[in-house]
């Protein structure tokens, strides 16, 4: 295979897929549903799917086509019905489960006599995708955040919602104010006043370890003491503290600033510490009993405190009381700002570090801490606040490089909290957690399983709570999992629900610090080894398991092989590909990946990349269909409760029904487009994004429809419909194929050290692998040894273009037409066309009608032969042999083995699009044929090449305005010489209605008809073959028995007396409809299956029309240059060439520059040269590899050659190449300027004026609105629209407008009266009210608005009264008047 003009089989994708289904896919599904139990679980249906067999179709292909049958085989499976109670087999037999439509050799299915095709579907591949959240707001700066480090003290409540402070501790400076009375500076510590927020932050800088657990524990006790004890004991405790603070002998009214300061500092700190709910959980009775033990243990551990036993007992009593009273304490509001206040940080920290009890040995302290911890653990004692063993962090403040100094003037204006917070932003130093996770982009992961609904995992902010009022609730963004619009919950909830512990989750997550604190903690009771969660998790929540557990269940969610491979590669997992369910590892990996994407700058997944899209071909669609059918069957059998009986096996029809439904009405099962061989071929190579599980065309974005770099060589960038499906329906390129996993591949030649290796098969690459290699395009020149000749080669690498040396190139594309689809590859010189026009060109080739006398194109691309072979519209030889006989109806070939193979030709058959399918033999008797050789030509195929149109002589010049705006002027030669003549075959379906009431039958004896009208019918009343029929002619004569009620009294009497059976009959014949004509070529009659008295059930009559080209038909070139014929000019009036040849077609020259489809000029000039030289050209696109402007050089060269060969110098004018002087046929004078003339390949499109022309005088009306129907099929009228109304209004044609709105449209009464008046020659009466207005009134009444009209009298009348007029019931057009009002004041508005 040279891959230049011989390419892989175009229909292989469909055929391979169906064969896979028959051999593998079917057994897979049958194995999945091998056992089905019924409702009672007593009966079991066992299917032996491995042993299935297919029974040969009852109809052959041709019979199925002709008689509207189905080409399908019965699928037979051995089935057992077992009774599990008595363990017996009730039924064991081969059972035909379904009838499966079979694919023909042309990759189509025959359903009800029509060829249908199952279009491949391109959908998102199963796997996981990460995308950035759209419309993400930047995070709110007022939002309080937890830091990662435990320097924010965290209070333990079972609900986990208390923190000591959200911010780092910071210290406003006090100011001194001069007090004139005491003649002394007075210190006002600002934490007392409301102005606490006015001040900026100073950071402490302290390195040594200066705090332990007991330091703060004592503060806590002191605070409790001051609240709970009597004033005497309170004083004692305070004195105790003052003793620690070296302030023993002083009273409270200190003169010394330092001491005031210190006490205030303590008070403030302790207020803050205690402003939380201390405990929620109630204490056990056991603890109350064991209080004494606790006290004794507590006293033993007093070595650390230099205090007497009494004081220690006091303290522990206080602690005890604290715990007991905690239940009664109301939950206090969190004070979100904790300020440690000091004047000179260094000085006061040293002062604090001198406290006696801090000078004790640290090691002892830790030991005691451990014992204290064990004690609390035993006694289920929950300390109110957790601390890290070293609180060094808390007092360690770093001065940043951008340290901002305190500016008093600026602070004067900070009045509100908001202003302060805004200013505070400048000074705040971010903690590790904030730095890591703050203000980053958020992502969402979407898991798409092969079976089951999509699962979304992503960040979601808890936005329902007002973060300013309730800073506790406004936690960090949580990672949530979402099954649908309603069901969602945090991932941690789900994992804990499934029984995982915090520790397991912590160890499995790479970014566990997002969810858990990662510093050593003093932790209470049983959760000693568990990490502390950052988020509020209600503990009682995990007892019940929700529907989210379903995602781990293969019956609800199945990733499939492809999904598992995709997830493994995306998340770097090493799971076995047999494990096709979602696992915990997947959830962990996805969560990690989400957080990783958040903190690292990475590109999100490109969902439009072809590595993330896969193709589901026929086989897989059918396999899914079987799965659905068997699921329905299982459900049905489970719901059946009646007794066991083999008759229950009838429920297997439900599988059959789902298959019929799919082939009959699915979006992917389409009526094959058989206009011409190309259209049928491209239809079978189409991939659609629509259909079940695909996109919804109304809600789809532009990105999905757009061309993507990964489409290169896989999906055609050109061929796609215009309109709402653009980009959603595409075509495979010429060389693309689908691999086992459903991903598209395209072939490349390997390049090693600058040499193209063209031995053997090319390498097929999928889109994701291709991104890692440097790939050169096909139009790079090579020498005869296949070495790349250029020094710098442009390559595609990671979806970008880079220039490299030949040695760096890894692969090279195999063909220049590898990029485009089959239809686009037929356009010569399409590299010179604008893409939009190339799109129109490739779409219009599919609409071209097969002509009576087709011609091969002079200028082609070399693919015409293969398209003709693969299209399935020709007969190809099955094996090598010798032709023994050829007739118009069959060809007989003798095989080498002596077998006689008979090929039946299709003669004048109707295609799905009413075009004519006709085989003409092109082999002769005695010829040796090879396997795969074409034996016959088909529609639009001449000598085994695709021939969609005609080579005609065209000129680009205006002619009297007849080619204005894409109109086309043609020569009458095209009509008389049948150049653009085509045959169309219409099928008329006549059904014989045989109800019990109306016995309808076909007959030639039709009452009250002229014998001339029935002379063309046979004895059964059916038209004879060969008759030419016109509108109104009878196709099938039918009579229907007259109803007895309509009979005359005499005939009724006769029937009553004699019991006469002979009823009267009336004519009910089927006649040709308006505008239809043609010759009857075949009639097909269908007999009833039951042996009833009457023969026919329905009759098909096939009528062929020969349609010559006429004004209004649409013709087009291959470059998107389409137009409507505006006038057929006699040949003597057409402009002619210097040698006297008149042109065939005149096109408008203005259609070229603005549309930029210059390829048509190259084509027509090369066609002219080919016509003169009697040569044909095969031009592959993208020919610049042979030199610059090579297309132009080739054409000039060939034109010059032709002018020399023919000795006609006018063919090539070196000053205006391609232009010739034309002579006007009417005057004989030359035209002023030379004109471009050439031989172009023009197509006649299926949009024929005969099918569009339509007229109506009277006809059917719509039932509700009573307006004329619309459309040709309903014999409808033309809508008189908004703009037409403007035209009448502009001319003031009021009566015309009124008529249009009433009697010509939907005023029923007026319509009838007008008709009456016209018939009787009377004056036309006044009009009534349009029906649509009445409908409007009814609609208004249905929403409770009563619309009525009132009659108001004249001004001069003295009487005043109102009369209600009902517009709908008692309406009389003549009596209705509107009088002027009697009194202006009576009119109420």
Swiss-Prot record:
Q: Which GO terms describe its biological process?
A: DNA-templated transcription
Q: What class of enzyme is it?
A: transferase
Q: What EC numbers are recorded for this enzyme?
A: 2.7.7.6
Q: Which InterPro entries match?
A: DNA-dir_RNA_pol_bsu_ext_1_sf, DNA-dir_RNA_pol_bsu_external_1, DNA-dir_RNA_pol_su2, DNA-dir_RNAP_su2_dom, DNA-dir_RNAP_su2_hyb_sf, RNA_pol_bsu_bac, RNA_pol_bsu_CS, RNA_pol_Rpb2_2
Q: Where is the signal peptide?
A: none
NCBIfam families in alphabetical order? PRK00405.1 (NF001616)
Q: What is this protein called?
A: DNA-directed RNA polymerase subunit beta
């Amino acid at each position: 295979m040279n891959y230049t003009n011989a390419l892989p089989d175009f229909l292989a994708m469909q055929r391979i897929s169906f064969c896979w289904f028959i051999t593998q896919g079917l057994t897979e599904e049958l194995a999945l549903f091998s056992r089905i139990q019924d409702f009672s679980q007593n009966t079991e249906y066992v299917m032996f799917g491995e042993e299935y067999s297919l029974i040969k179709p009852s109809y052959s292909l041709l019979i199925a086509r002709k008689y509207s049958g189905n080409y399908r085989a019965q699928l037979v499976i051995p089935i057992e019905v077992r009774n599990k109670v008595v363990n017996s087999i009730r039924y064991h037999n081969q059972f035909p489960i379904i009838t499966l439509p079979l694919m023909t050799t042309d990759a189509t299915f025959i359903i009800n006599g029509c060829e249908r095709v199952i279009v491949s579907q391109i959908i998102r591949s199963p796997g996981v995708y990460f995308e950035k959240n759209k419309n993400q707001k930047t995070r709110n700066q007022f939002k309080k955040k937890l830091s990662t480090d435990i320097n924010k003290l965290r209070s333990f409540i079972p609900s986990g919602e208390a923190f000591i402070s959200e911010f780092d501790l910071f210290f406003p400076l006090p100011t001194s104010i001069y007090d004139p009375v005491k003649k002394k500076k007075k210190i006002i510590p600002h934490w007392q006043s409301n102005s606490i927020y006015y001040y900026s932050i100073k950071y402490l800088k302290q390195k040594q370890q200066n705090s332990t657990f007991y330091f703060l524990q004592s503060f806590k006790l002191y605070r409790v003491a001051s609240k709970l004890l009597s004033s005497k004991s309170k004083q004692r405790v305070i004195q105790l503290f003052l003793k620690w603070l070296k302030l023993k002998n002083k009273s409270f009214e200190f003169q010394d600033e330092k001491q005031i300061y210190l006490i205030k500092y303590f008070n403030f700190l302790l207020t803050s510490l205690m402003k939380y709910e201390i405990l929620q959980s109630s204490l056990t009775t056991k603890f109350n009993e064991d209080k004494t033990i606790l006290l004794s243990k507590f006293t033993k551990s007093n070595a650390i405190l230099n205090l007497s036993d009494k004081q220690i007992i006091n303290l522990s009593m206080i602690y005890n009381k604290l715990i007991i009273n905690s239940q009664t304490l109301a939950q206090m509001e969190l004070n979100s700002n904790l300020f440690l206040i000091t004047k000179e940080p260094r000085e006061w920290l040293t002062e604090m570090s001198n406290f006696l009890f801090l000078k004790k040995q640290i090691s002892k302290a830790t030991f005691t801490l451990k014992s204290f911890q064990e004690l609390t653990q035993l006694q289920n004692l929950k300390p109110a606040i957790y601390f890290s063993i070293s609180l060094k962090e808390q007092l360690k403040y770093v001065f940043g490089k951008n340290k901002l100094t305190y500016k008093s003037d600026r602070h004067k204006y900070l009045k509100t909290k908001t202003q302060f917070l805004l200013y505070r932003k400048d000074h705040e130093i971010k903690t590790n957690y904030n730095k890591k996770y703050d203000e980053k982009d958020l992502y969402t992961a979407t898991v798409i399983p092969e079976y089951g609904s999509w699962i979304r995992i992503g960040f979601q902010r808890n936005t329902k709570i007002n973060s300013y009022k309730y800073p506790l609730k406004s936690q960090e963004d949580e990672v949530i999992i979402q099954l649908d619009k309603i069901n969602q919950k945090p991932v941690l909830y789900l994992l804990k629900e499934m029984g995982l512990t915090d520790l397991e989750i912590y160890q499995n997550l790479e970014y566990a610090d997002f969810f858990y604190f990662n510093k050593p903690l003093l932790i209470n009771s049983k959760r000693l080894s568990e990490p502390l969660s950052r988020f509020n998790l209600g503990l009682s929540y995990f007892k019940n398991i929700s529907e989210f557990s379903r995602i781990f269940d293969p019956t609800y969610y199945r990733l499939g092989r492809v999904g598992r491979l995709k997830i493994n590669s995306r998340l770097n997992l090493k799971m076995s590909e047999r494990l096709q369910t979602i696992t915990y590892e997947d959830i962990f990996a996805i969560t990690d990946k989400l957080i990783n994407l958040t903190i690292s700058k990475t590109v999100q997944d490109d969902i439009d990349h072809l590595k993330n899209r896969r193709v589901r071909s026929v086989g897989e669609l059918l396999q899914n269909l079987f799965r659905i059918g068997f699921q329905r069957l299982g459900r049905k059998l489970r719901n059946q409760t009646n007794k066991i009986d083999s008759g229950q096996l009838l429920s297997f029809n439900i599988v059959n029904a789902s298959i019929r439904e799919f082939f009959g009405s699915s979006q992917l099962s389409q009526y094959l487009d058989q206009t011409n061989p190309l259209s049928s071929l491209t239809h079978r190579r189409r991939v659609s994004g629509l259909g079940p599980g695909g996109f919804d065309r109304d809600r789809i974005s532009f990105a999905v429809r757009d061309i993507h770099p990964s489409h290169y060589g896989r999906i055609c960038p050109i061929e796609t419909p215009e309109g709402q499906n653009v980009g959603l329906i595409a075509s495979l390129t010429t060389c693309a194929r689908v691999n086992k996993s459903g991903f598209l591949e395209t072939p490349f030649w390997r390049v090693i050290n600058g040499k193209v290796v063209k031995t053997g098969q090319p390498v097929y690459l999928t889109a994701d692998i291709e991104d890692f290699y440097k790939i050169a395009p096909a139009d790079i020149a090579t020498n005869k040894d296949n070495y790349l000749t250029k020094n710098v080669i442009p390559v595609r690498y990671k979806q970008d273009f880079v220039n490299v040396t030949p040695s760096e190139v890894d692969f090279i594309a195999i063909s220049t037409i590898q990029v485009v689809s089959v239809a686009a590859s037929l356009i010569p010189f399409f590299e010179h066309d604008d893409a939009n026009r190339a799109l129109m060109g490739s779409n219009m080739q599919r609409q071209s009608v097969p002509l009576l006398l087709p011609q091969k194109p002079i200028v082609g691309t070399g693919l015409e032969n293969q398209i003709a072979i693969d299209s399935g519209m020709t007969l190809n030889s099955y094996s090598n042999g010798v032709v023994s006989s050829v007739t118009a109806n069959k060809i007989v070939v003798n095989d080498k083995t002596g077998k006689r193979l008979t090929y039946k030709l299709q003669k004048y058959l109707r295609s799905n699009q009413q075009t004519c399918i006709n085989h003409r033999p092109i082999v002769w008797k005695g010829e040796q044929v090879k396997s795969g050789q074409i034996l016959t030509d088909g529609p639009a195929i001449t000598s085994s090449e695709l021939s969609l149109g005609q080579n005609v002589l065209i000129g680009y010049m205006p002619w009297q305005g007849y080619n204005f705006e894409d109109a086309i002027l043609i020569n009458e030669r095209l009509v008389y010489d049948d150049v653009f003549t085509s045959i169309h075959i219409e099928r008329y379906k006549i059904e014989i209605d045989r109800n019990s009431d109306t016995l309808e039958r076909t007959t030639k004896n039709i009452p009250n008809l002229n014998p001339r009208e029935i002379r063309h019918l046979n004895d059964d009343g059916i038209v004879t073959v060969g008759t030419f029929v016109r509108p109104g002619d009878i196709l099938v004569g039918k009579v229907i028995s007259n109803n007895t009620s309509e009979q005359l009294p005499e005939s009724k009497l006769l029937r009553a007396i004699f019991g006469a059976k002979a009823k009267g009959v009336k004519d009910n014949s089927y006649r040709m409809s308006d505008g239809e004509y043609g010759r009857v070529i075949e009639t097909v009659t269908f007999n009833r299956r039951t042996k009833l008295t009457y023969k026919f059930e329905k009759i098909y009559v096939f009528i062929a029309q020969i349609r010559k080209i006429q004004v209004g038909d649409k013709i087009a070139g291959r470059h998107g240059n389409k137009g409507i014929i505006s006038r057929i000019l006699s040949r003597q009036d057409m402009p002619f060439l210097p040698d006297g040849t008149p042109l065939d077609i005149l096109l408008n020259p203005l259609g070229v520059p603005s549309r930029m489809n210059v390829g048509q000029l190259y084509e027509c000039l090369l066609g002219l040269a080919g016509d003169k030289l009697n040569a044909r050209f095969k031009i592959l696109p993208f020919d610049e590899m042979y030199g610059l402007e090579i297309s132009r050089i080739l054409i000039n060269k060939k034109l010059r050659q032709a002018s020399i060969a023919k000795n006609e110098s006018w063919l090539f004018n070196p000053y205006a190449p391609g232009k010739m002087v034309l002579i006007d046929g009417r005057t004989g004078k030359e035209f002023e300027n030379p004109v471009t003339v050439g031989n172009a390949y023009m197509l006649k499109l299926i949009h024929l004026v005969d099918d569009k022309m339509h007229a109506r005088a009277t006809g059917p009306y719509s039932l509700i609105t009573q307006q004329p129907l619309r459309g040709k099929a309903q014999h409808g009228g033309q809508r008189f629209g908004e703009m037409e109304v403007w035209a009448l209004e502009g001319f003031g044609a009021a009566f015309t407008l009124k008529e249009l709105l009433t009697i010509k449209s939907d005023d029923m009464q007026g319509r009838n009266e007008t008709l009456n008046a016209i018939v009787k020659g009377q004056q036309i009466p006044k009009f009534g009210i349009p029906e649509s207005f009445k409908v409007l009134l009814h609609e208004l009444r249905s929403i409770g608005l009563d619309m009525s009209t009132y009659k108001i009298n004249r001004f001069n009348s003295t009487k005043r009264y109102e009369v209600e007029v009902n517009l709908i019931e008692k309406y009389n057009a003549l009596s209705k008047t509107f009088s002027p009002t009697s009194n202006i004041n009576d009119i109420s508005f």
